């Protein structure tokens, strides 16, 4: 199993008795599996953003010919998901993924299905726990505007601005990821 995570699916293991009565184990990992085919399928509102989807396909981290490793496969899927969920599509999710391994040909066929969900926009700010200060204090630090397209980076910038003030010991800024109201996240 350890060799499989590194892309070796046809190892040969041989045990030999040593002159001193011990056992020597010789492992030939076999050929490293390489990517033979990649299919990336998108559904949801991002389906109309052809340039963005083309850019995500071009940036796919495991192209044909690359060695297959489990860690790289996991990272490539996360990078693909982040390419949607960090900007505009906060509810994006991988709905299916598979790596079909053929040990005989040392090849892998990869498929990822991802649903972007709806495009999100920032809504009005809901505040809890602001007992000691007037709500207008928050406006000084440039919150996202209602209707502005969702961006995780924009959200974190606002949270950081609030955390860097002397007014708050801790701050959590997040959106409602409910797909029922993506226009007012």
Where are the model-predicted features located?
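Periplasmic polypeptide-binding modules associated with outer-membrane biogenesis and secretion
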Residues: 1-185
């Amino acid at each position: 199993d350890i060799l499989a995570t590194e892309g070796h699916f046809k190892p040969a293991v041989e045990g030999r008795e040593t002159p001193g009565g011990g056992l020597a184990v010789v492992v030939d990992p076999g050929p490293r599996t390489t990517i033979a085919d990649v299919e990336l399928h998108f559904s949801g509102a991002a389906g109309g953003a052809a340039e963005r989807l083309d850019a995500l396909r071009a940036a796919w981290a495991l192209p044909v010919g690359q060695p297959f490793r489990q860690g790289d496969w996991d990272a490539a899927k996360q990078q693909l998901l982040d390419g949607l969920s960090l900007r505009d599509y906060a509810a994006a999710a991988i709905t299916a993924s598979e790596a079909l391994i053929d040990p005989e040909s040392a090849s892998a066929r990869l498929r990822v299905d991802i649903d972007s969900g709806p495009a999100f926009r920032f809504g009005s700010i809901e505040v809890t726990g602001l007992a000691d200060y007037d709500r207008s204090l928050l406006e000084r630090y440039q919150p996202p505007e209602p209707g502005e397209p969702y961006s995780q980076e924009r959200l974190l910038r606002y949270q950081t601005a609030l955390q860097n003030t002397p007014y708050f010991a801790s701050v959590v800024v997040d959106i409602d990821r409910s797909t029922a109201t993506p226009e007012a996240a």
